[in-house]
């Protein structure tokens, strides 16, 4: 890779401004990245991080400001042009051709040739060479569809490296990874740093920022707040700069009071194993029940079985003393169940459709009038209720949901389900990919729903979240219930011990 003085900047974005009709998304924002460094880019959802990067890649045309890369003023017109110049991005949503091989994906559009034919031997050798440099152990000949999420991310990094990328931007790269996979990813990122790359690292996970980053740039409401070395900064200082105020507590004060049991789950077993096996628990009115467990504990399988997504082979689901079948999601919804799924982008939202559609899609039937026509008045009224009740920040109900921040998207999904009038609200990783300020708002919302006597089940991989918001925690281990603990009386060590019981 090209040698560059460590004191020089690889990338300088200076005074970048971007306006949309009625909104100034960026106001004179700066981002300067050095070689041999990992640079955190932080800010709440909606702070302008994505808009800034879209200006870099030419997806948006900036209104003012300068972009200098390797000492030259540039204005990329596309991601492809940026990649070929040496600026690459590893997205949250991985963009790969699943039915093609690993090496096909790396060299797509620039295959080495031998005469009129693709030189498969050279392509294999070049792929192995890149993998060896980055300590990646993947067979270049396997189809991408067979890879894990972490391997797909490593493939994206290898592709960037094969383009001799000087700047690699990583957007929430660990959101779907296990701890072991995260550690391996960090090793690869550090190798890129050693080779002279400048890495822009976007994450809401503070512990990762402190572990791996050298410098940090903080944005708030489209404005550049500060850029400084990470050394000497505290988590509270960063949060304060991100939210513009001191966040005195990470979780709202618990005000809900669990009452009588409304849901009893007895010996729940899913049809297709390995999955949930002989799981029993109760949920009380106004209670927030957490579900904890290590990766592979089958936490998600519980709520999917209750919601009719997974077929049940045995066991009972009893709501208010009545035995339910919940053979499919439609029946579960009619019985008062709602499920906010784990993968917001792939199974939660229709990103290219507006807020109205995304708010009402779970219960379209109730908006039908005579001749099967939809009531625009009621649809508009209910959409506005979702926006107001969930405190969604949006210019209009006609705004495409994909353009909103993750926190606002999640609020709309929760609002969508509240329109169905559920008694049991199940939330799978409800704050994944959401910034610290928006997390607090989601927690407040969950607490308000518990105070309105909803029974709430929360699955989370974040131990502080479970300990901060729940009343009791069901600990899963390898598809089985290892125990249920009172949140106020338990510890992280006890939960981890239970989570290992059936391994």
Swiss-Prot record:
Coiled coil: none
Broad enzyme group: translocase
Compartment(s): Cell inner membrane
A GO CC term assigned to this protein in UniProt: plasma membrane
Key words of the record: ATP-binding, Cell inner membrane, Cell membrane, Membrane, Nucleotide-binding, Repeat, Sugar transport, Translocase, Transport
Recorded catalytic activity of this chain's protein: D-galactose(out) + ATP + H2O = D-galactose(in) + ADP + phosphate + H(+); methyl beta-D-galactoside(out) + ATP + H2O = methyl beta-D-galactoside(in) + ADP + phosphate + H(+)
Similarity-based family: Belongs to the ABC transporter superfamily. Galactose/methyl galactoside importer (TC 3.A.1.2.3) family.
Name of protein: Galactose/methyl galactoside import ATP-binding protein MglA 2
Organism encoding this protein: Photobacterium profundum (strain SS9)
């Amino acid at each position: 890779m090209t040698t560059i003085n460590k004191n020089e900047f690889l990338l300088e974005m200076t005074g970048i401004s971007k306006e949309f009709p009625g909104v100034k998304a960026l106001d004179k924002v700066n981002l300067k990245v050095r070689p041999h460094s990992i640079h955190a880019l932080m800010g709440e959802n909606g702070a302008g991080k994505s808009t800034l990067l879209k200006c870099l890649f030419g997806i948006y045309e900036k209104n003012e400001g300068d972009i200098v890369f390797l000492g030259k003023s540039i204005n990329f017109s596309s991601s492809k042009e940026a990649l070929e110049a040496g600026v690459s991005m590893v997205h949250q949503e991985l963009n790969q051709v699943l039915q093609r091989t690993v090496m096909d994906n790396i060299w797509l559009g620039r295959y080495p040739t031998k005469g009129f034919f693709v030189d498969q031997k050279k392509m294999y050798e070049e792929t192995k060479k890149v993998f060896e440099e980055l300590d990646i152990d993947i067979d270049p000949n396997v189809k991408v569809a067979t890879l894990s999420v972490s391997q797909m991310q490593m493939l994206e990094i290898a592709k960037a490296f094969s383009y001799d990328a000087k700047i690699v931007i990583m957007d929430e790269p660990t959101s779907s990874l296990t701890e072991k996979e995260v550690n391996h990813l960090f090793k690869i990122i550090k190798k890129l740093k050693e080779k002279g790359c400048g890495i822009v690292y976007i994450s809401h996970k503070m512990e990762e920022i402190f572990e791996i980053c050298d410098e940090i740039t903080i944005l708030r409401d489209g404005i550049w707040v500060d850029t400084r070395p990470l050394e000497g900064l505290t988590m509270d200082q960063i949060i304060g700069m991100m939210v513009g105020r001191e966040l005195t507590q990470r979780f709202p004060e618990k005000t809900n009071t669990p009452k009588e049991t409304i849901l009893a789950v007895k010996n729940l077993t899913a049809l297709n194993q390995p999955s949930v096996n002989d799981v029993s628990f109760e949920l009380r009115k106004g209670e927030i029940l957490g579900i904890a467990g290590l990766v592979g504990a089958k936490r998600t399988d519980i709520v999917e079985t209750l919601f009719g997504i997974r077929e049940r082979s045995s066991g009972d689901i009893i709501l208010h003393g009545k035995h339910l079948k919940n053979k499919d999601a439609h029946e579960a919804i009619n019985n008062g169940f709602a499920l906010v799924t784990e993968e917001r982008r792939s199974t939660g939202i229709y990103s290219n459709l507006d807020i109205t559609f995304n708010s009402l899609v779970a219960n379209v039937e109730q908006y039908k009038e005579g001749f099967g026509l939809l009531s625009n008045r009621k649809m508009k009224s209910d959409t506005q209720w979702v926006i107001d009740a969930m405190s969604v920040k949006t210019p209009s109900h006609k705004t495409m949901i994909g353009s909103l921040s993750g926190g606002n998207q999640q609020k709309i999904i929760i609002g969508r389900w509240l329109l169905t009038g559920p008694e049991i609200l199940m939330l799978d990783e409800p704050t994944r990919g959401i910034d610290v300020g928006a997390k607090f708002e989601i927690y407040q919302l969950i607490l308000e729903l518990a105070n309105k006597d909803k029974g709430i089940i929360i699955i989370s991989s974040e131990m502080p979240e479970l300990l901060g918001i729940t009343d009791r925690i069901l600990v899963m281990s390898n598809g089985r219930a290892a125990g249920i603990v009172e949140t106020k009386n338990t510890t992280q060590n006890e939960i981890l011990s239970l989570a290992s019981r059936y391994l």
